């Protein structure tokens, strides 16, 4: 993998082997040492006016390893479910459009977690995995600890009825099925990481 895009809510840091001039970033930084790298991350977390940074290094494997060490890593999995009608399954949580996903439990297989989370959050059964999609990364802080969450995504198929039940206990207020041509109008109500996934998997 030549790039890693890590989301900080609707901002992001791009990790790459060389400067990614195709994108419009506020800042470019070449990786030299971990001390400077961790200062860049800390400053980015606190300065919300910076929308994006590109950190690059020819040895991207080493850079990515050092970047991850800054955080406590957690794993999650979720699904992009396509109904035989052509609609895709979405949830609404905290006022934002999203996809069903959740933390991988201890000893749980990633694929089984993704299937379970779709069932629990949306109230459907009988869906199955078609293939994996590229993972997404985002950060969050809890009780003074910075976490890096890797979410493994899977394209799923479903041919059952479209009756759903949102998991209210998880803050999910709505579950809906949307056609691809409805997705361009939801950008203002979706996370940037979700739009990346939609653009890659549905709209391209």
Predicted regions mapped to residue ranges:
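Short hydrophobic/aromatic beta-strand or adjacent loop that forms the aromatic wall/cage
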Residues: 3, 76, 149-153
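Unchanged
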Residues: 104-193
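Acidic, metal-coordinating catalytic segment for phosphate/diphosphate chemistry
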Residues: 34-78
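Active-site beta-strand termini and strand-to-loop segments that position acidic
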Residues: 81-84, 156-158
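Charged phosphate-binding loop/patch that engages nucleotide di/tri-phosphates or the phosphate backbone
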Residues: 193-204
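Conserved Nudix-box catalytic region and its N-terminal flanking loop in Nudix hydrolases
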Residues: 28-31, 82-120, 124
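N-terminal leader/capping segments at the start of a protein or of a new domain
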Residues: 1-46
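Short, surface-exposed beta-strand-loop junctions and turns on beta-sheet-rich folds
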Residues: 13, 20-23, 96-98, 106, ...
């Amino acid at each position: 993998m030549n790039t890693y895009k890590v989301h900080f809510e609707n901002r992001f840091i791009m990790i790459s082997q060389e400067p990614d001039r195709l994108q419009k970033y506020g800042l470019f930084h070449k990786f030299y040492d971990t001390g400077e790298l961790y200062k860049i991350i800390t400053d980015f977390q606190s300065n919300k006016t910076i929308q994006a940074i590109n950190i690059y290094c020819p040895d991207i494997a080493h850079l990515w390893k050092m970047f991850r060490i800054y955080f406590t890593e957690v794993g999650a999995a979720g699904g992009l479910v396509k109904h035989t009608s052509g609609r895709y399954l979405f949830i609404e949580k905290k006022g934002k459009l999203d996809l069903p996903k959740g933390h991988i439990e201890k000893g749980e297989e990633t694929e089984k977690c993704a299937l379970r989370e779709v069932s629990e959050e949306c109230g459907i059964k009988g869906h199955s995995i078609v293939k994996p999609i590229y993972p997404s990364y985002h950060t969050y802080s809890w009780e003074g600890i910075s976490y890096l969450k890797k979410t493994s995504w899977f394209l799923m198929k479903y041919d059952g009825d479209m009756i759903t039940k949102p998991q209210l206990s998880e803050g999910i207020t709505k579950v809906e099925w949307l056609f691809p041509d409805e997705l361009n109008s939801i950008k203002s109500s979706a996370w940037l990481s979700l739009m990346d996934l939609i653009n890659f998997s549905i709209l391209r």
